[in-house]
């Protein structure tokens, strides 16, 4: 229970931090008409054109990014505030990790033991039947060795 309340407190702190940071960054800039500067553009020195520089595209991209970020953070926090869903995600990942570990232990420990047991008990029937299906010369060699 303590972990769930601690994670809830951390989520509330994280929820407040991005909104506070974005409010500081996205303060409205003063709109000055005299501040617009001009820029020369052209392919060669002879055909330059005077073009007015504008920050409207940059402001538009920033506001789009800000809105997208706020939307994503709010959806993330709505999702993570549901403690039952958070518990299910953690439990499923824990179960998957345990199953993966048992799978590794099985293939590194039990399968070689079964193969070794088959060889030590001189259980060549399986091996000869398998090799006879694969290639005819192996069947002749194994029949001579076993007999």
From Swiss-Prot:
Keyword NAD: no
TM region positions: 85-105
Biased composition (Polar residues): 28-37
Stretches the record annotates as Disordered: 23-48
Alphabetically ordered keywords of this record: Membrane, Transmembrane, Transmembrane helix
Subcellular location: Membrane
A cellular component term, taken from the record's GO annotations: membrane
Entry membrane topology: Single-pass membrane protein
Domain of life of the source: Eukaryota
Record bears the keyword Transmembrane helix: yes
Protein name: Uncharacterized protein YGL230C
Annotated source species: Saccharomyces cerevisiae (strain ATCC 204508 / S288c)
């Amino acid at each position: 229970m303590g972990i769930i309340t601690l994670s809830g407190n951390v989520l509330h702190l994280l929820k407040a931090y991005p909104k506070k940071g974005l409010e500081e960054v996205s303060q409205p800039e003063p709109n000055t008409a005299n501040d617009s500067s001009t820029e020369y553009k052209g392919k060669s020195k002879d055909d330059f054109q005077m073009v007015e520089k504008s920050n409207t595209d940059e402001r538009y991209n920033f506001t789009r990014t800000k809105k997208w970020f706020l939307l994503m953070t709010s959806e993330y926090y709505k999702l993570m505030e549901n403690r039952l869903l958070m518990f299910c995600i953690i439990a499923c990942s824990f179960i998957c990790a345990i199953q993966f570990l048992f799978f590794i232990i099985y293939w590194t420990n039990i399968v070689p033991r079964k193969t070794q047991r088959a060889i030590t008990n001189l259980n060549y029937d399986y091996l000869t039947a398998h090799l006879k299906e694969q290639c005819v010369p192996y069947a002749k060699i194994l029949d001579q060795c076993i007999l």
